[in-house]
């Protein structure tokens, strides 16, 4: 949801892009999922998603358009950004917030515990994820139903 200030915090500070580049360089497939319904805040069609990625210099492996919310509901995504890490064996290894400070202030990024980064490193190192579930924060996903 490009209109969400919590998403803006991480893209505006280049935090999301750094995470995307680090992860994909390590062989991770990073999927950005847009589950907002047409006419709702955060909705983007393919052309708009491409424009947003270019504008923000985003580096996901791919963007999945989910206007019916099927994938979002499958993973119980409630807010944006709501982060998920799926291990190489296909099991859900992490779900929750990108970090520990639920604010829209970019200055808080360096002070926060980087939940997602830690989970990615632990999965890549073949270790259990210490905090496999954390509280996500952000704007609610605007589902069709």
Predicted regions and their residues:
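Residue-level signal for beta-strand positions within conserved beta-sheet cores that form or flank
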Residues: 26, 59, 135
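Short pre-active-site segment immediately N-terminal to redox-active cysteine/selenocysteine motifs
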Residues: 1-5
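Hydrophobic pocket-lining residues within nucleotide cofactor-binding pockets
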Residues: 35, 77, 98
């Amino acid at each position: 949801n490009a209109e969400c200030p919590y998403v803006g915090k991480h893209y505006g500070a280049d935090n999301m892009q750094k995470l995307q580049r680090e992860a994909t360089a390590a062989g991770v497939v990073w999927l950005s999922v847009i589950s907002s319904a047409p006419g709702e805040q955060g909705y983007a069609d393919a052309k708009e998603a491409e424009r947003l990625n270019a504008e923000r210099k985003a580096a996901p492996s791919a963007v999945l358009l989910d206007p019916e919310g099927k994938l979002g509901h499958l993973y119980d995504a409630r807010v944006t950004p709501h982060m998920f890490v799926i291990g190489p064996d296909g099991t859900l290894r992490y779900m929750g917030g990108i970090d520990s400070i639920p604010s829209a202030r970019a200055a808080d990024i360096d002070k926060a515990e980087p939940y997602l980064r830690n989970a990615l490193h632990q999965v890549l190192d073949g270790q259990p994820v210490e905090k496999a579930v954390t509280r996500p924060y952000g704007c609610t996903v605007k589902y069709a139903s």
